[in-house]
Amino acid sequence: MADSEVLLELSDIKKEYKKGVPALKGVSLSVNKSEVVVILGPSGCGKSTLLRCINGLEEIQSGEITLQGNVINKDKTKWHLIRQRIGMVFQSYELFDHMTVMQNLLLGPLKVQKRDKKEVTEQAEKLLERVGLLDKKNSYPRELSGGQKQRIAIIRSLCMNPEIMLFDEVTAALDPEMVREVLDVMLELAKEGMTMIIVTHEMEFAKAVADRIVFMDSGEIVETNYPLEFFRNPKTERAKKFLNIFNFEKKDKVESALLI
């Protein structure tokens, strides 16, 4: 459960693509320490762009990104230091195919953070054991399933000891059978108090993991609410329409049965 200390704050974030196409239209959001914020919304609404802006992978045109009281988006030369504090996991894993699992895990802490190899190796092995993949430490990514690769990607970020984790549709490329093993890791992180911002289309997972739901549409935050309230009684028509999409199949089956 989140405490009252604000860890990350976004103030009037605006982002435009080429030709003046707006991606984010003045997004403001505060995230408390140990809070899990799940961002929902239709494809193309700016969810992933927002995460990439937080991590410095996309440049914003105006606004401020504040981490623990310090504005982090004004000095571009410090982004390599800031990214060490903000872990990000993508749907495409981003593992180096020519490196073993352990080599992938050690790369950032050793090359970027200049940490002791023995210390990082012990940390990596503990994390691998925790997710049931210690026996894969000498394997290459090509030898792993999609679910295993995504768990390795999460551990790689954790090895950098981040203050906040960003997850961008991490189950989107997985077979249904592999989705649960990845979501279980994220649920455990939430229980342990990791601050997380999660973009997902897994509605049941969102209900289970979120302290707060943020609904976006067309580059703006349209609605924010507690999970139970959001899913039971969304405040905006746009959110209602979005949630009805996920109820369509069930509704269609019921109506078909009534016609028989």
Task: Report the location of each language-model feature.
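ABC-family P-loop ATPase nucleotide-binding domain
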Residues: 1-14, 251-260
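ABC family nucleotide-binding domain
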Residues: 5-8, 14-218, 222-223
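C-terminal boundary and immediately downstream tail of ABC-type ATPase nucleotide-binding domains
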Residues: 224, 228-260
